[in-house]
């Protein structure tokens, strides 16, 4: 990995194009249109910043987001072993990409929201929104966070969801060995699998839910696949949690 890096520490409203082979460090800045040319940007980090990244074909492995607002869009993006933490709000939209061992933890206001409970989350809670299609997301992790996940044809094997409030829409995703612990899913969360003969349905049989609140339709599909349930509360379809 190259040791060269570029530091952006001023507000940039115009397009900024960065060549491959550099670590991009953005600190206390606003970068409205950051274009990363196809190639490697291992170890890039965004600290206390507001950044919009266009990352088609980029390797953003080991990316770090700390106390920032981050928007990342692209196809063929690698974000393996990335970490967004400490109050980072993010919007991620990826296709044909990889988020192996990618982790989100401690979104803004999540600690207070989780303490109050889903019915009293309040308006000061920031969240992470992740949309992914046809992507590898094994060992994906979300902890102590409020998030919205929309994933289609993704591999979420060995993923972990811990102390979260989530809106999830999983379409034909493999949740083999996925663990949901102390998780509340909104009543409009959806789980869809086109056939019982798919790897997604077989994988769901290996998922586990402990101390969770699940909407009825989500629960019924998971239990029909053989997912493990322990201390799970099922909410009716007309009940809004958050």
Name each model feature, range by range.
Residues 2-242:
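Tandem repeat scaffolds
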């Amino acid at each position: 990995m190259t040791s060269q890096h570029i530091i952006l520490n001023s507000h940039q409203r115009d397009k900024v194009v960065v060549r491959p082979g550099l670590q991009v460090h953005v600190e206390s800045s606003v970068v409205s249109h950051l274009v990363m040319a196809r190639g490697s940007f291992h170890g890039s980090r965004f600290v206390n910043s507001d950044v919009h990244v266009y990352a088609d074909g980029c390797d953003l492995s080991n990316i770090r987001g700390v106390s920032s607002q981050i928007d990342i869009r692209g196809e063929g993006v690698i974000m393996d072993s990335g970490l967004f933490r400490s109050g980072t709000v993010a919007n991620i939209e990826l296709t044909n990409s990889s988020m192996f061992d990618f982790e989100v933890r401690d979104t803004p206001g999540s600690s207070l929201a989780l303490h109050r409970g889903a019915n009293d989350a309040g308006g000061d809670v920031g969240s992470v929104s992740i949309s992914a299609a046809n992507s590898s997301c094994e060992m994906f992790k979300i902890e102590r966070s409020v998030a919205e996940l929309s994933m289609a044809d993704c591999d979420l094997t060995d993923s972990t969801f811990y102390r979260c409030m989530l809106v999830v829409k999983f379409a034909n995703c493999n949740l083999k060995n996925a663990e949901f612990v102390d998780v509340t899913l909104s009543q409009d969360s959806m789980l869809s699998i086109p056939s019982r003969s798919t790897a997604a349905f077989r994988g769901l049989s290996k998922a586990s839910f402990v101390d969770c609140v699940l909407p009825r339709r989500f629960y019924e599909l998971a239990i029909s696949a053989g997912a493990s349930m322990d201390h799970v509360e099922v909410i009716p379809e007309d009940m809004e949690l958050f």
